[in-house]
Amino acid sequence: MTCQEDCSCKNNEAPTTKTTATTTNVGDGPGPGPIPGNNDDDDDDIWSDDDTKLIPENDIIRSHYKKGYVDGITQAKESSLQQGFDDGYPEGAKLGIKVGEILANLINQCKDRNRQGDDDDDDDDEQSVRFNEAKKELNIVNVLKKSYFDEDLNLKKSNDNKETDESYHELINKWENEMK
């Protein structure tokens, strides 16, 4: 650390700011005496606490350390967050497209039945219930559960055929099979 022109160390002055604690005696006579760390009387005492002196350089050093720490943490979070987003976005987009296709097919099935002139309200209710069930199950929170991904955040391979290179998402496959 370099000194500035008006620094107290160049002027051979003592630091201008000093904090002191009050001395409290615990009873009169024999006993513990003053509370340790209180050094009102004697600055030359070898048992005195140096932390009671506020040295301006310490404040500067402390603020630089803190700023460096905060900057480092922020930069690390930003870089790892961006890298995770870049790696996971394509896979998430594919899953989102599949979910959208499933929900669109269910809506189209409802509309096709209405166009064909089916007056059976039970079928409409069944299709509506099925669509609402799909919407609930295919919610983003359910689709992106950790159980569907390996430790590298790639979709797990099919349990039936581990030799294929195809990814497998149990929930999406369930609804794709229901569409057939």
Swiss-Prot record:
Residue segments, region deca-GX3 motif: 68-108
Compositionally biased residues, Polar residues: 1-15
One GO location term (cellular component): cytoplasm
Biased composition regions of type Acidic residues, renumbered to the chain: 39-49
Places the protein is found: Cytoplasm; Nucleus
UniProt KW keywords: Cytoplasm, Nucleus
InterPro entries recorded: Essential_protein_Yae1_N, Yae1-like
GO biological process: protein maturation
Region (Disordered): 1-53, 112-131
The UniProt record lists the keyword Methyltransferase: no
Function: The complex LTO1:YAE1 may function as a target specific adapter that probably recruits apo-RPLI1 to the cytosolic iron-sulfur protein assembly (CIA) complex machinery. May be required for biogenesis of the large ribosomal subunit and initiation of translation.
Family classification: Belongs to the YAE1 family.
Description of how the protein assembles with itself and partners: May form a complex with LTO1.
PANTHER family found in the cross-reference section: PROTEIN YAE1 HOMOLOG
Descriptive protein name: Protein YAE1
Organism from which the protein derives: Candida albicans (strain SC5314 / ATCC MYA-2876)
Gene name in the database record: YAE1
